[in-house]
Regions:
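Glycine-rich, often acidic-flanked micro-motifs
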Residues: 1-14, 107, 111-121, 135-208
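Conserved lysine of the Walker
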Residues: 126
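A generic structural signal for short, non-catalytic loop/turn and secondary-structure boundary residues
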Residues: 16-20, 47, 55, 65, ...
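Extreme N-terminal, non-catalytic leader segments
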Residues: 55-115, 192
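Functionally constrained cores in energy, signaling, and assembly domains
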Residues: 3, 9, 27-28, 45, ...
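Long, basic/Gly/Ser/Thr-rich N-terminal segments
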Residues: 1-79
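Post-Walker A alpha-helix
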Residues: 129-130
Length: 208
């Protein structure tokens, strides 16, 4: 990923260049057709295979094209962490959809050397359960989105995400953490960015 918007949560890859980059993230104005749909027709989201865009009030508009480009147009007075949150999760998920890559809405830990995914609706406790396993010394693989593929033995594997979780204030407090030690990731929902560098496994793991 090559991004004009700093995504401090992601692992830096010094070998990315214009020849091998998969996704380019740019910041700028939306195409006129999207502006018209958004501003005149009050449309907040659009999906048509190779083109996906969505609008988040007080945050910005995101346009994902052909699984290669993400264009972000911030709203005036936006909060950077909110802007970044919708880029990391919803926009990247749209790219995976366009690439026809199987992605599960869930979080994954490693149990008995296999990846276990906790999945469910938003707010069902996926990240909370994952954080509890992390606290009990289990290794961490991915939060919110689990990207699946098939290895050379035709076995499903879970690919690593990045070394961070997004947790709610009550979850952090319930697990005995001090919220003041973490950065707010999405201020409107009081979500905090929680590093997982010591628990993170940056290699694909077979699905349990």
């Amino acid at each position: 990923i090559k991004s004009e918007i700093e995504i401090s949560e992601f692992i830096v890859n010094d070998y990315v260049n214009d020849d091998n980059v998969d996704i380019v993230v740019k910041q700028g104005s939306m195409p006129e057709k999207i502006k018209k749909q958004r501003d005149e027709e009050n449309i907040a989201r659009f999906y048509d295979g190779n083109e996906i865009w969505f609008y988040i009030k007080n945050v910005g508009t995101y346009y994902i094209k052909e699984a290669k480009t993400i264009l972000v147009e911030p709203e005036e007075g936006y909060i950077f962490n909110d802007l970044k949150a919708f880029l990391i999760w919803r926009s990247m998920a749209a790219c995976l959809l366009q690439k026809d890559i199987v992605t599960i809405h869930g979080s994954a830990v490693i149990i008995n050397e296999k990846a276990v995914i906790f999945t469910g609706r938003s707010g069902s406790g996926k990240s909370t359960l994952t954080a509890a396993f992390r606290k009990d010394t289990y290794k961490f693989l991915s939060d919110e989105l689990c990207v699946l593929s098939i290895d050379e033995d035709q076995y499903p594997i879970v690919n690593p995400g990045y070394p961070q979780q997004r947790l709610a204030k009550n979850t952090l407090e319930g697990l005995g953490f001090n919220c003041n030690d973490f950065i707010i990731s999405k201020e409107s929902n009081q979500m905090y960015s929680v590093p997982a560098n010591n628990d993170f496994v940056n290699t694909p793991i077979k699905l349990a």
